[in-house]
Design a protein with these regions (language model features):
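Conserved ABC transporter NBD signature motif
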Residues: 59-67
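The feature captures the beta-strand-to-loop junction immediately N-terminal to the Walker
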Residues: 36-38
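ABC ATPase nucleotide-binding domains
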Residues: 32, 48, 73-230
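Non-catalytic connector elements of ABC transporters
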Residues: 238, 248-346
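Helix-to-loop junction immediately C-terminal to a conserved catalytic motif
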Residues: 51
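Pre-Walker A (P-loop) beta-loop-beta motif of ABC nucleotide-binding domains
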Residues: 23-34, 88
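ABC ATPase nucleotide-binding domain
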Residues: 6, 26, 62, 331-333
Length: 346
């Protein structure tokens, strides 16, 4: 079971705080969408509005084509999975998973069979008789997911479900969430502030900032071709180079770059750290001195002082075998296609 969601012109105020500002969004049935943004951007408020825990001040919510704007949570085809999991400590896993089915009046045998199927789906069939305090954090997270899916919601809302897990377990659970979502086909809407998590699991990322949607698209598009400077910066490290449009390109401390901008208008030229290299490229950034460098396993992260702009620090992700030391001299290159340019106000 699954359903599309349509959000139309949502606005919400908490007193004088305008938490959601004209938010409109279409989510397809069976899609895995992440709401990504910093604390206070409105992503959790938007999730709460979809779940019925907050009534929007203005706007409309359709789920499966039906108006759910003022429908209470219990009567919506949605289930919300919170970060703290909220498992019942006195119940075993089977009873935790089947609790919602019991409340809906399903017979004992049928709900226990359903619970066993879901525990098998999340890899905990053999642990059905255990209680939550006998499980690891990752196992409790999987039980909470099984319980949320037991009532067969058309939409599953996940409020930072992996936030309490350590890095290694979080990455494992990212893979499991994506696999389980593909198997059940339910629409998943997942709130996170972690851009790597969003890229790992989402079909589509919705970047939020100050109550508005800044950008939305596939992880590849959002990372490689962000629509706004905020989205570019929030999706990962980004080097900023000041520029100004001219008839022949964009004038920067590194010379005229082959980019298009309005003449005389200021601009910010952006370049990802992994786009900077020491091999040949079609654009030279000239010589630079290593300020410091650190080994990150798959790359060497270096802070570089370019000769062309010594007051600026460039961040580069260079090959892990680079073995850089402070004071080393490098010649930097990049590709014209890796630049992104954004207009700015003086």
């Amino acid at each position: 079971m699954t359903a599309p969601i349509t959000l139309s012109n949502l606005n919400h105020w908490f007193g004088s705080l305008h938490a959601l500002k004209d938010v409109s969004l279409e989510i397809e049935a069976g899609e895995y969408v992440t709401l990504l943004g910093p604390s206070g951007c409105g992503k959790t408020t938007l999730l709460s509005v979809m779940g019925g825990f907050v009534d929007p001040t203005e706007g409309k919510i359709l789920i499966g084509g039906r108006d759910m704007t003022n429908v209470p949570p219990a009567k919506r085809p949605t289930t919300t999975m919170f970060q703290d999991y909220a498992l019942f400590p006195h119940m075993n896993l089977r009873d935790n998973v089947s609790f919602g089915l019991r409340m809906s009046g399903m017979g004992r045998r049928e709900r226990h069979d359903r619970a066993k199927d879901l525990l098998e789906l999340v890899g905990l069939f053999a642990e059905a008789g255990k209680r939550p305090n006998e499980l690891s954090g990752g196992q409790r997270q999987r039980v909470a997911l099984a319980r949320a899916l037991a009532v067969e919601p058309k939409v599953l809302l996940l409020d930072e479900p992996l936030g309490a897990l350590d890095l290694k377990l979080r990455r494992t659970m990212q893979d499991e969430l994506k696999t389980i979502q593909r198997k059940v086909g339910t629409t998943f809407i997942h709130v996170t502030h972690d851009q790597e998590e969003a890229m790992a699991i989402a079909d589509r990322i919705v970047v939020m900032n100050e109550g508005r949607i800044e950008d939305q698209g596939t992880p590849t598009r959002i990372y490689c071709e962000p629509a706004t400077l905020f989205a570019a910066d929030f999706m990962g490290e980004m080097n900023h180079i000041p520029g100004r449009g001219t008839a022949s390109g964009v004038e920067t401390p590194f010379g005229i770059l082959p980019l298009v901008a309005k003449e005389q208008d200021p601009a910010v030229v952006c370049l990802r750290p992994e786009a900077i290299g020491t091999g040949k490229g079609d654009v030279s950034l000239g010589p630079a001195t290593v300020r410091d460098a650190a080994f990150f396993g798959t790359f060497c992260r270096a802070h570089l002082i370019p000769k062309a702009d010594p007051d600026r620090v460039l961040i580069a992700h260079l090959p892990p075998a680079s073995l850089l030391a402070a004071g080393d001299e490098l010649i930097l290159y990049t590709k014209a296609e890796d630049f992104r340019i954004f207009d700015v106000k003086e």
